[in-house]
């Protein structure tokens, strides 16, 4: 069962990426969001397509926007790979194989139209989805499998996907991820 915003803690970081504490997720996403630990995940199918998701419209940060497969926060003391596996299962109902961290040092800051700020050290993972997608509608409004070149095109426009995905896609391209197209 997914944690609620009131129960979920995020790991706070200093500017060097060291853990300095934790805080309730519901209290850290605002105009002065402190630096905290997160992750992004891109899942591919056997045809090499990537799973895009549309964030639920009631989410606190970047509601209703199309983005990479899954994002989330590890709990204090939770290994990042375990957090990725947990959140993908909770949000999308699928398992993962071949999970690997491909951009371990990714960091970004993005300001939403409503002034809410994301400020994260956000390692990026890629893997293969196992099973049929059954999204939790409290987290995911929609989903679609697309060829990588469609993800690349969305990133080039910037406004078509989340700001973090728009930054991550060229880095993933440079790392050779998604080049089956």
Swiss-Prot record:
Reaction(s) catalysed by this chain's protein: isopentenyl diphosphate = dimethylallyl diphosphate
Cofactor annotation: Mg(2+); Mn(2+)
Single Gene Ontology MF annotation: isopentenyl-diphosphate delta-isomerase activity
The UniProt record lists the keyword Cytoplasm: yes
Residues reported to bind Mn(2+): 29, 36, 73, 118, 120
Active-site residues, as the UniProt record annotates them: 71, 120
Pfam families in the cross-refs: NUDIX
CDD domains linked: NUDIX_IPP_Isomerase
EC identifiers of the protein: 5.3.3.2
GO cellular component: cytoplasm
Source superkingdom: Bacteria
Cofactor note: Binds 1 Mg(2+) ion per subunit. The magnesium ion binds only when substrate is bound.
Binding-site positions, Mg(2+): 91
Principal cellular location given in the protein's record: cytoplasm
A single BP term in Gene Ontology: isoprenoid biosynthetic process
PANTHER family to which the protein is assigned, alphabetical: ISOPENTENYL-DIPHOSPHATE DELTA-ISOMERASE
Protein name: Isopentenyl-diphosphate Delta-isomerase
Organism of derivation: Mycolicibacterium vanbaalenii (strain DSM 7251 / JCM 13017 / BCRC 16820 / KCTC 9966 / NRRL B-24157 / PYR-1) (Mycobacterium vanbaalenii)
Gene that this polypeptide is encoded by: idi
